[in-house]
Curated annotation (Swiss-Prot):
InterPro entries: PCMT, SAM-dependent_MTases_sf. GO terms for biological process: methylation; protein modification process; protein repair. Pfam families: PCMT. This is Protein-L-isoaspartate O-methyltransferase. Coiled coil: none annotated. Its EC number is 2.1.1.77. One of its GO terms (cellular component) is cytoplasm. Belongs to the methyltransferase superfamily. L-isoaspartyl/D-aspartyl protein methyltransferase family. The gene is pcm.
Length: 222
């Protein structure tokens, strides 16, 4: 009985979160449906599980975070992901963003610098029977050139500037969403959307954000 009540409460909290995202301007029904179909509580530790459907970031292992649901929804909506697209995610983290993307596109390739995080994320995706995500440990700043070009790229850590190696792995007409440090403004970041065109790139600044920094190389873990 208690378990059923807990499940009912979780579903109600999820519905309230989705309604809140709509009120904040998220309109893409496919994106909202994807978030509704991914159980966020599966991607966080038991300590914070009761906060799974509150609209804020939560800590995960290795000093990283699972992003605020609004930011996940906003970034995903701004990517305009199509069903047949191939998407690169830089920064697997808990695996939550990859799970959301998996509901929207043909295949997700995701890179994580922490082996511990990647192992746990892959297990969560397997438990949810998500089979269109390919993951590896690696340096996200280098992208995944063996699988390039990508229709879309999403970066879930803040870069000091737009990573050219990632831009180079976009298809022409492809989009990338990346948090970028604001030059001369300590600690400030802007979410930036990059479109690769035939003669260069178009850059559009979207909104202020706060992400953990994009760190080069594979993490050394004890």
């Amino acid at each position: 009985m208690n378990e059923e009540t807990s499940m009912d409460e979780g579903e109600q909290e999820k519905i309230e979160l989705i309604m809140g995202l709509r009120r904040q301007g998220i309109r893409d029904k496919r994106v909202l449906s994807a978030l509704e179909r991914v159980p966020r509580e599966k991607f966080i530790s038991a300590t914070f599980r009761k906060q799974a459907y509150e609209d804020h970031a939560l800590p995960i292992e290795c000093g990283q975070t699972i992003s605020q649901p609004y930011i996940v929804a906003y970034m995903t909506e701004q990517l305009h992901v199509g069903e047949r697209m191939k998407v690169l995610e830089v920064g697997t983290g808990s695996g939550y963003q990859a799970a959301v993307l998996s509901r929207l596109c043909r295949r997700v390739y995701t890179i994580e610098r922490y082996r511990t995080l990647l192992k746990d994320a892959v297990k969560r995706l397997e438990d949810l029977h998500i089979h269109n995500v390919t993951a590896k440990v690696g340096d996200g700043a280098q992208g995944w050139p063996e699988q390039a070009p990508f229709d879309r790229i999403i970066v879930t850590a803040a870069a000091p500037s737009v990573p050219q190696k990632l831009v180079d792995q976009l298809k022409e007409g492809g989009l990338m969403i990346v948090p970028v440090a604001v030059s001369g403004a300590r600690g400030e970041q802007k979410l930036v959307r990059i479109e690769r065109t035939g003669d260069g790139v178009k850059r559009e600044e979207l909104l202020p954000v706060r992400f953990v920094p994009l760190v080069e190389g594979v993490a050394k873990e004890s």
